[in-house]
């Protein structure tokens, strides 16, 4: 148990408090901006390299993971995507996209950042987009990646991650007001 908690603490999922055990850290703007900016830098470059260096088998895996993700979205939602249900396929799609990069350390960093940002996505329930918008946004990322044009893929990735950041920031900003408006909840001093 201690080893598992130590690993979660090292990855930023829990924090240790002196003489008080562990707790899940609060969501905050600084961490969100740090993770998102790091993702824009690291994953966009990883995607650029994947677009330039990925082979036919990699392209096939990106297409297949996108098809599975699209199918899951269409099966689980009509007006708004249920991220709690579709997140595994979403993660699989992003892993497939970066898997064309031949550098495992870069891919590992991308995966770690994605997992930490998933905590924000799921806790904030921030993405209230319809199925067509979500599918379209990921298609806009996939197409330049598959074209082999590293610069276009890099730009598409930065745009994709920038949109995600702006949505999460807006939700995080309004979260305290939403929490205090719930029945039976008192506003925090």
Language-model segment annotations:
Residues 2-52, 165, 169-189:
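Short linear motifs at protein or domain termini
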Residues 5, 14-16, 88-90, 134-135:
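Short hydrophobic/aromatic segments of transmembrane alpha-helices and their interfaces
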Residues 19, 42, 64, 133-136:
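Alpha-helix N-cap/N′ positions at the starts of helices
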Residues 30, 47, 52, 56-123, ...:
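Conserved amphipathic alpha-helical segments that form helical-bundle/coiled-coil interaction surfaces
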Residues 126-130:
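Solvent-exposed loop and edge beta-strand segments that line ligand/cofactor-binding
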